[in-house]
Curated annotation (Swiss-Prot):
Transmembrane segments: 13-33
Subunit text: An alpha/beta heterodimer. The core complex is formed by different alpha and beta chains, binding bacteriochlorophyll molecules, and arranged most probably in tetrameric structures disposed around the reaction center. The non-pigmented gamma chains may constitute additional components.
Residues the entry annotates as binding a bacteriochlorophyll: H29
Topological region Periplasmic: 34-67
Cytoplasmic-facing ranges: 1-12
Alphabetical list of Pfam families matching this protein: LHC
Name of the molecule in the record: Light-harvesting protein B-870 alpha chain
Compartments, record wording: Cell inner membrane
Annotated membrane topology: Single-pass type II membrane protein
GO CC annotation terms, alphabetical: organelle inner membrane; plasma membrane; plasma membrane light-harvesting complex
Purpose of the protein: Antenna complexes are light-harvesting systems, which transfer the excitation energy to the reaction centers.
Name of the encoding gene: pufA
Alphabetized SUPFAM superfamilies for the sequence: Light-harvesting complex subunits
């Protein structure tokens, strides 16, 4: 294994690896930010939920009005 470093300069190999990993991390984060589920900056966009309107009683009397 030590002979591989005779072919490649260790400093250039580590810098190239760091640049590659940084680029890969940025790419993955941008892909996740582009999705609705994993976008942690804007939060998940919730679809509007249709709700049924509950019937309200016709006449409501409070205790203050009853006195």
């Amino acid at each position: 294994m030590w002979r591989i470093w005779r072919l490649f300069d260790p400093m250039r190999a580590m810098v190239a690896q760091a640049v590659f990993l940084l680029g890969l991390a940025v790419l993955i984060h941008l892909m996740l930010l582009g999705t609705n589920k994993y976008n942690w900056l804007d939060g998940a966009k919730k679809a509007p939920v249709a709700t049924a309107v509950a019937p309200v009683p016709a006449e409501v009397t409070s205790l203050a009005q009853a006195k």
